[in-house]
From Swiss-Prot:
This is D-alanine--D-alanine ligase. It is found in: Cytoplasm. Pfam families: Dala_Dala_lig_C, Dala_Dala_lig_N. It catalyses: 2 D-alanine + ATP = D-alanyl-D-alanine + ADP + phosphate + H(+). Mg(2+) 1 binds at D305, E319. Belongs to the D-alanine--D-alanine ligase family. It comes from Chlorobium chlorochromatii (strain CaD3). Mg(2+) 2 binds at E319, N321. Residues 146-352 form the ATP-grasp domain. Pathway: Cell wall biogenesis; peptidoglycan biosynthesis. GO terms for molecular function: ATP binding; D-alanine-D-alanine ligase activity; metal ion binding.
């Protein structure tokens, strides 16, 4: 039986470039090579595609240790120097000519998780893992995600949305408007970034100004939300027409919230699988995850994140990630492992879901 050629896309033009590489390294290491042939395609910071040679080398680079010892900016600069040193010509973007049967997307954030890459692959006639164009674009926007899931009956945190252009034009007025609508402590989030990049927890006006400045520099729209005091619970969802929800996972941040360092460097957060909540509450969270998944039109996979309010036990949606982290310490593969699906089988199942006739 001939093997299926899988184009593994990673890197990309988002702020999550380096994490995408680490996710791709784990995916490549767990790919069933008896069924699949790997064609790694690395997308540089500037958007060039580098196939096979340098891309394959990059999959064996110990990037996680580099991130631990330096800033993201320093790591990005080092990667760009590696690309220049490789002096490899960009590859052909005709995926059919490259013999690609299916694409595995390990591209986090903008230009990979937001529907643009999905749309490109649709026009090429190449099936791909994860959600389709609409769900990818919709869930990338935290503000629109909240509107959709609230309409489906799922609770969301109180908040407001800010256009960066409005803030830059009149910061004092926008800050006053925020304070009139949302109580401290609050969170300031770029609407369309993941991995906690650009997120700040704010306790007063003095902290609000730099938080909004930082978020507005990263995105054209910013979400401001009230803090939900309670447990952070996550669920991995897998499937197309008949999705399944994993056991719940729980995050106990080592800091005020689960930031970039804790997500990918494993510094201080504690992870609990299953979550330390009653089984009845776990069932409610899983049902809510499936409701959100369907309401948003998701397919393939998504990680659905919630808060459980400590005073009321109400389940409040935090966000939905359609290409969740796939590093060795990422919650999605760990929750699936705890639900009886090994990392290797998870990769295979995602490729099978991508190739289902209804997805094509």
């Amino acid at each position: 039986m001939s093997r299926t050629t899988v184009a593994l896309f990673f890197g990309g033009q988002s702020a999550e470039h380096e994490i995408s590489i680490i996710s791709a390294q784990s995916i490549a290491a767990h790919l069933d090579t008896e069924r699949f042939t790997l064609l790694p395609i690395y997308i540089t910071h500037s958007g060039e595609w580098l196939c096979d040679g340098f891309a394959r080398t990059l999959l064996t680079t110990n990037l996680a240790s580099k991130l631990r010892g330096s800033s993201r900016e320093e790591t990005a600069a080092a990667l760009q120097q590696m690309v220049r040193n490789a002096a490899q010509a960009p590859c052909n973007r005709n995926l059919a000519a490259l013999g690609v049967d299916v694409a595995f997307l390990a591209l986090h954030g903008s230009f990979g998780e937001d529907g643009r890459m999905q749309g490109f692959l649709e026009t090429c006639g190449i099936p791909y893992t994860g959600c389709g164009v609409l769900a990818s674009a919709l869930t990338m926007d935290k503000a629109l995600t909240k509107l959709c899931v609230a309409d489906a009956g799922i609770a969301v945190a109180q908040g407001t949305n800010i256009l960066s252009a409005d803030y830059l034009a009149n910061p004092n007025a926008v800050e006053a408007s925020v304070e009139a609508q949302v109580s401290y402590p609050l969170f300031v989030k770029p609407a369309s970034l993941g991995s906690s990049i650009g997120i700040s927890k704010v306790h007063n006006r003095e902290e609000l100004h730099p938080a909004l400045q930082a978020a507005c520099a990263l995105d054209w729209k910013v979400v401001v939300e009230s803090t939900v005091k309670g447990r952070e619970i996550e669920v991995a969802v897998l499937g197309n027409a008949d999705p399944i929800a994993s056991v719940c996972g729980e995050i106990e941040p080592g800091k005020e919230f689960y930031d970039f360092q804790d997500k990918y460097m494993g510094n201080s957060a504690k992870l609990f699988i299953p979550a330390r909540i009653p089984e009845s509450l776990q069932e409610e969270v899983r049902r809510s995850a499936l409701t959100a998944y369907r309401a948003l039109g998701c397919s393939g996979m998504a990680r659905v994140d919630f808060f459980v309010d400590e005073s009321t036990n109400s389940v409040v949606l935090n966000e939905v990630n359609t290409i969740p982290g796939f590093t060795d310490i990422s919650m999605y593969p760990q929750m699936m492992e705890a639900s009886g699906i090994s990392y290797r089988n998870l990769i295979t199942r995602l490729l099978e879901l991508a190739l289902e006739p209804l997805r094509r």
